[in-house]
């Protein structure tokens, strides 16, 4: 791996992935809303920021997202669901990453191996949903998973050595998760980044369109 592009590179996990890659000697390009004005809810800003880059990148990581929808905590009951929170979650956690992918595709090599990794969440798995709750966030992440799965199918026709996957990083110690970790084991962002990169290092085109956790175990859709 020689060149990597990290979207969401000032967030806890995105920054840790970028730092870990740089420590390996990879040439890392970092882009984010706070540093570069890349707003995943604004396609014009996505197009402008990514359109200014010159590829190809061996690795593109989309590490954007949020838990709170329209300023509300994740719902514990159906009665707490609002249209505003649902729409906000889909804008940030599904539509935004897909638009980033759309404008990032020209930055992937067509004749060489590459990985496009999008951070998802285990709670977006329909098959693994046993306790309910977090309705807006779950639904948005499930939609993201479907979008990436479909994109991987299309990508296989044009970039035969590419691998596009969704990755669950675990519960990472960041401001993003601080209020919701509860009894779940949390890991520091550098450890989470190392875990994810260990998975990314082993990916092949045959695994494209799938959903993996930080240990490389496949998660059901």
Can you name each region flagged by the protein language model?
Residues 19, 98, 142-153, 190-197:
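Conserved active-site helix of classical SDR/Rossmann-fold NAD(P)-dependent CH-OH oxidoreductases
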Residues 66, 70, 74-90, 110-158:
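Catalytic loop of short-chain dehydrogenase/reductase
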């Amino acid at each position: 791996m020689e060149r990597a592009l990290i979207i969401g590179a000032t967030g806890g996990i995105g920054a840790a992935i970028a730092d870990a890659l740089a420590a390996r000697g990879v040439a890392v390009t970092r882009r984010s809303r706070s540093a570069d004005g890349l707003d995943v809810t604004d396609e014009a800003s996505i197009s402008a920021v990514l359109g200014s880059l010159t590829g190809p990148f061996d690795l593109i990581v989309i590490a954007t997202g949020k838990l709170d929808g329209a300023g509300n905590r994740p719902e514990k009951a159906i009665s707490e669901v609002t249209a505003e929170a649902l729409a906000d979650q889909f804008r940030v956690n599904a539509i935004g990453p897909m638009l980033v992918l759309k404008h990032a595709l020209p930055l992937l090599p067509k004749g060489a191996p590459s990985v496009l990794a999008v951070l998802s969440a285990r709670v977006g798995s329909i098959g693994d949903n046993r306790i309910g709750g977090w309705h807006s966030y779950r639904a948005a992440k499930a939609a993201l998973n479907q979008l990436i799965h479909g994109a991987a199918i299309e990508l296989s026709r044009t970039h035969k050595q590419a691998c596009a996957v969704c990755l669950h990083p675990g519960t990472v110690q960041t401001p993003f998760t601080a209020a919701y970790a509860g009894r779940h084991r949390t890991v520091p962002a550098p450890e989470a980044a190392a875990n994810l990169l260990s998975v990314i290092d082993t990916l092949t085109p045959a695994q494209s369109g799938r959903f993996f956790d930080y240990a490389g175990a496949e998660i059901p859709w």
